[in-house]
Amino acid sequence: MNSRCASINKILPFSCVDGPGNRLAIFLQGCNLRCKNCHNPYTMGICDNCGDCIATCPQQALSLQNGVINWNADSCEQCDTCIQQCPRQSSPMTLTYTVDELIAITRKYAAFINGVTVSGGESTLQLPFLIDYFKAIKEAPDLRHLTCLIDSNGTLSLNGWQKIAPFMDGAMIDLKSWSEETHIYLTGRSNQRIKKSIKWLSEHNLLAELRLLYIPEKTDYLENIEPLSHFINSLGESITIHINAFHQHGVYGEAKNWRSANKEQIINLQNELILRKVNLIKTPNIYT
């Protein structure tokens, strides 16, 4: 038995946008970046059971029991009023799962999926749980066919990647800007460790995808197209580059006033990369 626990915000039994094929997508709670453009800002913080959200719930689905927020999923209508009021950018609707409980859920859908993707928040903040979960999948005869992917911001240390590498099939990493200055403006943290993670993962054939989020007038990919292209080309020819288009849906604060990226802008960035021999590029199917 494995009783190691993790705080989980959401589980999607079937996802076609969180890696190749049909996947079980698990979103862990907590993030160490503070991205202005985050579409899931309620996954950033950890609930401290302050109780401020209880009175805001129109369905009275929240209560405080023994100093801990209790969420009644049957009464909840997913209106998100509570998370919009949370001062910690958290959610009272998170649940705690053990490795064994999550394996049971995985087994339920195993015949219908190609693999699992653990995202967030930032999934690697709960690294011991992640290692045990992936290890359990690889050791189970009826689950070991599933690929185990991590969707990460790349801030994990190289020592951390070395610990989980034997049990994962790859990681999808976001490079939110090229320059450190722009990255700090967008996320609150430097991108130096992220670049090191990307290089290490590529060298060990574990970089499943490199993601670039284009935000008009905010990201600096085009201004730094030469060093960016050189960096991408140094990763090897088999690395998929996924250009995502920023849209305003789900964001808060100043990013709500930022312009959404359009198809012309994404194609322009794609063409500039192709001119510099970056060829394996995915672009959005839909623009908002």
Model regions: which residues?
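Flexible, glycine- and charge-enriched loops at secondary-structure boundaries
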Residues: 50, 92-95, 187, 191, ...
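N-terminal [4Fe-4S]-dependent radical SAM core
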Residues: 1-69, 75, 84, 108-112
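Conserved AdoMet/S-adenosylmethionine-binding subsite of the radical SAM
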Residues: 100-257
